[in-house]
Amino acid sequence: MNPSYLFSLSESKRALYRNQPDLAQGRQISEPEEYEHPPFVENAALRLWYNEQPDRYMTHWHNATEMIVALENCYTVTVQNQIFHLQPGDILVVPPGALHSIQGNPKGEGYRFIFLFELTIFNSMYDFRFVRSAFSNAVLINQTTCPDIYEHEITVLMQCAEVYWSDSPIRILQIYSLLLQFFICYTQNFLAGKISSNAQSQLANSDHKTAIQTLLS
């Protein structure tokens, strides 16, 4: 079980996070298996939601990386026909281009963060190829799959939310700095063989491991 103190929210933060800093309307989802154009923040390639609606998001895909953090109650996400039953505190990273759908709690209750962001700004960094390979399939991060790094990873994402809803003039830069910390931490442990096989999507097979070995050679 994930320690709840790492991701619990005060009522004041809930109230703050319900409102997008720059967007009046809610998230728009495309038709089943259609491309979704993420409504990014102006002059940025990211968007964060504090989501408490029981809506079901039909099968779709986009060029952005999607990260889902369950905060209260369960949340079911299907990525490329693999089903993930997220528990409070679980982090699921969905890679760009992956078909996925989201099913809310059947009782209509639940809270979660949904992050959408593009990482192409890091592609010019030679070492970033290791990150792309480590996250080429869906990745589940929690206290069971990644006990050595879970506290760091969930703390970084909660910091992302605080910065996103702050009035910092450099908040986008701060968020990308935090995201880079998140991906570096996981990738370092992945390359060192410290990540549980349960963290990686079952779609990750020997071909994926071979790709990593090729990068390291």
How would you label these PLM feature ranges?
Residues 180-201:
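Linker/hinge segments immediately adjacent to helix-turn-helix/homeobox DNA-binding domains
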Residues 1-78, 82-84:
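Generic protein-terminus/edge-of-domain signal
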Residues 81-96:
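Short acidic-glycine-tyrosine-enriched beta hairpin
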Residues 97-126:
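Ligand-binding loop in jelly-roll beta-barrel domains
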Residues 4-5, 130-181, 185:
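Amphipathic alpha-helical segments enriched in hydrophobic/aromatic residues interleaved with Lys/Arg
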Residues 150-153, 176, 196-217:
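A short, Lys/Arg-enriched amphipathic alpha-helix from helix-turn-helix/homeodomain DNA-binding modules
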